[in-house]
Swiss-Prot record:
Keyword Phosphoprotein appears in the UniProt entry: no
Organism whose genome encodes this protein: Rhodococcus erythropolis (strain PR4 / NBRC 100887)
Family under the similarity heading: Belongs to the SepF family.
GO cellular component terms attached to this protein's record: cytoplasm
Domain of life: Bacteria
Phylogenetic classification of the source organism: Bacteria, Bacillati, Actinomycetota, Actinomycetes, Mycobacteriales
Name this polypeptide is given: Cell division protein SepF
GO biological process, one term: division septum assembly
Amino acid sequence: MSNLHKFKAYFGMVPLDDYEDEYVEEPDQARRAPRRSHDGYAERDDREFVEPAFSKASYAPSRRDEEDAEFDRYDSRPRVDTVPSRSSRPAMAPRPASRGNLAVDARAERPEARRAPVVDDGGPLAKITTLRPQSYAEARTIGERFRDGTPVIMDLVDMSNADAKRLVDFAAGLAFALRGSFDKVATKVFLLSPADIDVSAEERRRIAETGFYSQK
């Protein structure tokens, strides 16, 4: 069949019986041929690709393996408890127990230096200066005597209450600043004591009884 006749038969220009397609059977043959070929490959695959038996590779033990084996042998050894050796140095004798274990207690046990008493053996109230200020302007004199380390008795009887209160406030601040003491011994009579002077209650009573005669 010529190509022209095939073309006419394809588009319905000639009867279909006259059209002989040489390719009708070829697709079936083409489909069957790969199937047979595939079956052959399957047989060859089953026959040729057999899983080989892998043999265990042999290698020389490394340094780490030897160390691990050494640790295993160490763990299997019997354990021996060691007794700590006693020191040849003699033990220190314990110190006598005090009131506590703090360092504050040790310092507290030290003897404190007592401040010199106001009244000494040379004479009663020999170290005291008695001042009877008339106004607040005399506060400077009181401060200078107290700063020099001399106990000062302030007799404020002749002052007004307002000025006396101002002078008492000044003396109290002065004693606090110089770490001294400020005590009342009688009505409107006060004692300023420096830091190194210790005034007891008995001495304050004696100061009040003497009438503050030791004036300077």
